[in-house]
């Protein structure tokens, strides 16, 4: 019983950490990364379709992404979708490819992005703590039903706290890495 609760809590905490890492990977840094365009959706014959299903995105150099659209007639629609996104990018057609130069980040924009990333980190920490609370509540319910002893309850809470501390350390480490990446010139 208790081991199931602990395993469930551990899996859920790990999912919180992974969701945070995925979220901050979408925040633009000074370097080009294909994942930057993951959230872009293009109207493909009346159907909203993710860009990665319509084209391949590669890094041409440290500040330029190259998009090779599979259906050449979709080039203008892809450009329009990139411009409509809130990424502040201006794509340009070059024959069969679309190039997306990444403008350098200003100091002010770097600070704004750092604030956003810190907010995401706090949300991840809160999510991890909520998982801890749920696990502890389930264990307390077992104690109340006299299915476990007080020693088991205390031991379980200590283990859940250790898992919580480990998950929060992972969030903090990912946050520190992203902040360092954002502040590089």
Curated annotation (Swiss-Prot):
Q: Where is the protein situated, by its record's location annotation?
A: Cytoplasm
GO MF terms, alphabetically ordered: ribosomal large subunit binding
Keywords annotated in UniProt? Cytoplasm, Protein biosynthesis
Q: Name one Pfam family in it.
A: RRF
GO BP annotation list? cytoplasmic translational termination; translation
Recorded GO CC terms: cytoplasm; cytosol
Q: Which Gene3D superfamilies match?
A: 3.30.1360.40, Ribosome-recycling factor (1.10.132.20)
> What the protein does?
Responsible for the release of ribosomes from messenger RNA at the termination of protein biosynthesis. May increase the efficiency of translation by recycling ribosomes from one round of translation to another.
Q: Which family does it belong to?
A: Belongs to the RRF family.
Q: What's this protein's name?
A: Ribosome-recycling factor
Q: Which organism is it from?
A: Salmonella typhimurium (strain LT2 / SGSC1412 / ATCC 700720)
> What is the gene name?
frr
